[in-house]
């Protein structure tokens, strides 16, 4: 029996009645036992995840996570049913993120580490949920932290079918540790798959140092002093076939190598980072999102560095209402919508459907896409599942967008409607599902997400 079959059967055996679910059960982590040739499951990645687990369990980190819970509880969102119910998951999730950043800060022994991901079990390691800042379920996120005084080479190999887009973004700091801004920090350099020079066998090399390119292809220049964050995003539209790009990094020059840090030192750094990240993202949403009207899409904006368009908002719905959004892909290679808890941590997306992209969703007859956000399953294929909660954030991203697109064309309509009238307002030909079909949809999604562990 294949791993995918085991995963799908495990989901089916949960016996969930998906129609009219009022409160979600705790999501189960993706299960996989990938071979040692796993693209993401390298020995360095597994060692990284083990150290993250050790750091999270230290008293200093546990104390800081408790402070984050208190911070969230004191915020206005902490008084809402959805906000109160998700404080623990959100605080623990961003705590894992802080530990990931801290462990990855060894610029003398660098690694391109998979981060900000769903709970998963592999190689005997259980990694808990890590997410914040409305992480995109369509992305495989990897981080590399580098020293401006050193020189690095990133070696990659693309396996077809490749991601719909791969994007390397060099930032001046870890998002959430600098001044508040719409992008969470300053972008220093970018490199996308459209610019990347790749050999016939799918391999490539990226150089990263403080010198100009001087004729070098695939070069990213950084300032000569300080530590900087390289974020790598492999964007999947087709979870069932697309593969992450194999990446490895070597430090090829720089100052003398410093001694290894102890877990205690890393934990102190992680706690400091968490004390910055949690208030930052709380302030971020309180400044940029929550002052707007609920259940309303904000004006679509152009993102820097050729990263397309984005918009979003927040929803607050009673159990008998739904938010109906109709979007235009405007020719983008990828258009995706997702929902998160009120703190910006994605609702469960490995085996529930809290996100959909234009390859996963069912289109309308005119090529647009209509999505439904509702606490209870309305039986619509394009339903976004908030795990039984009536509130949270939503984000919409259009990536690899053609030239000349008008951002205002991307939103067709939005409305809050009673669930009793939902079928009246949905476009003709809307794809509906039975509870058993929903279960099959979820099982297929879980199997496709588990490919990331293989």
Language model region names:
Residues 1-23:
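Gram-negative bacterial Sec-dependent N-terminal signal peptides
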């Amino acid at each position: 029996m294949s791993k995918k079959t085991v995963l799908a059967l495990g989901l089916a055996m949960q016996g969930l009645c998906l129609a009219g679910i009022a409160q979600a059960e705790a999501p189960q982590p993706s299960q996989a036992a990938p071979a040692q040739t796993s693209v993401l499951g390298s020995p360095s990645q597994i060692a990284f995840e083990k150290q993250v687990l050790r750091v999270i369990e230290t008293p200093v980190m546990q104390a800081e996570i408790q402070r984050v819970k208190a911070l969230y509880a004191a915020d206005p969102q902490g008084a809402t049913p959805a906000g109160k119910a998700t404080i623990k998951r959100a605080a623990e999730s961003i705590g894992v993120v802080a530990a990931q950043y801290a462990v990855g800060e060894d610029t003398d022994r660098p690694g391109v580490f998979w981060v900000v991901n769903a709970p998963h079990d592999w190689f005997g390691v259980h990694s808990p949920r890590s997410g914040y800042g409305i992480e995109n379920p369509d992305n495989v996120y990897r981080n590399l932290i580098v020293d401006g005084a050193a020189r690095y080479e990133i070696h990659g190999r693309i396996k077809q079918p490749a991601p719909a887009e791969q994007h390397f973004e060099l930032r001046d700091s870890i998002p959430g540790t600098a001044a508040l801004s719409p992008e969470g920090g300053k972008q220093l350099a970018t490199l996308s798959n459209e610019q990347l020079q790749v050999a016939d066998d799918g391999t490539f090399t990226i150089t990263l140092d403080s010198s100009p390119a001087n004729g070098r292809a695939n070069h990213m220049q950084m300032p000569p002093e300080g530590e900087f964050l390289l974020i790598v995003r492999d964007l999947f539209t087709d979870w069932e076939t697309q593969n992450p790009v194999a990446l490895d990094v070597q430090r090829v020059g720089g100052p003398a190598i410093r001694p290894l840090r102890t877990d205690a030192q890393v934990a102190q750094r992680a706690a400091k980072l968490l004390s910055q990240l949690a208030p930052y993202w709380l302030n971020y949403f309180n400044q940029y999102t929550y002052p707007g009207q609920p259940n309303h899409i904000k004006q679509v904006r152009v993102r820097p560095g050729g990263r397309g368009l984005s918009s979003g908002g927040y929803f607050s719905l009673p159990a008998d209402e739904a938010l109906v959004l109709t979007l235009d892909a405007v020719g983008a290679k990828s258009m995706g919508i997702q929902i998160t808890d009120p703190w910006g941590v994605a609702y469960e997306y490995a085996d529930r459907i809290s996100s959909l992209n234009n390859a996963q969703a069912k289109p309308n007859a005119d090529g647009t896409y209509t999505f439904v956000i509702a606490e209870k399953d309305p039986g619509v294929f394009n339903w976004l599942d908030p795990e039984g909660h009536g509130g949270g954030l939503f984000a919409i991203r259009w990536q690899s967008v053609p030239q000349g697109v008008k951002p205002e064309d991307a939103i067709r309509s939005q409305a809050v409607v009673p669930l009793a009238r939902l079928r009246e307002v949905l476009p003709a030909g809307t794809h509906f599902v039975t509870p058993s079909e929903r279960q099959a949809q979820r099982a297929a999604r879980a199997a496709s997400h588990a490919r990331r562990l293989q």
